[in-house]
Amino acid sequence: MLKIIMIIALIVVAISMLAMFVRIIKGPTLADRILALDAIGLQLMACIALYSIFIGSEYLLVAILLIGILAFLGTAVFSKYMDKGKVIERDNEHHH
């Protein structure tokens, strides 16, 4: 019974990932695309967690942590880009 529930949960999360891919393509704004990309990262983490429980292995939990860190960094970078128009600010003044 638990395996059937896990499979159904994986299917539901996969369908929601497809909806987020549509949001990335259609937009309409950059903020929508950023949020959809972040949501895909969370959904991917959920899929890996469900699969890890399904196969009874804790080794995939490291992958979940890595994806979470990368999703956070990506969202932070995109947010800074939206706010300032660039990611890396350079100080062009030379102090002698």
Curated annotation (Swiss-Prot):
Its main location: membrane. The chain crosses the membrane at residues 2-22, 30-50, 53-73. It comes from Staphylococcus haemolyticus (strain JCSC1435). NCBIfam families: PRK12600.1 (NF009248). Pfam families: MrpF_PhaF (PF04066). GO terms for molecular function: sodium:proton antiporter activity. The gene is mnhF1. InterPro entries: MrpF/PhaF-like. Mnh complex is a Na(+)/H(+) antiporter involved in Na(+) excretion. May form a heterooligomeric complex that consists of seven subunits: mnhA1, mnhB1, mnhC1, mnhD1, mnhE1, mnhF1 and mnhG1. Keywords: Antiport, Cell membrane, Hydrogen ion transport, Ion transport, Membrane, Sodium, Sodium transport, Transmembrane, Transmembrane helix, Transport. It is a multi-pass membrane protein. This is Na(+)/H(+) antiporter subunit F1. Belongs to the CPA3 antiporters (TC 2.A.63) subunit F family. It is found in: Cell membrane. GO terms for cellular component: plasma membrane.
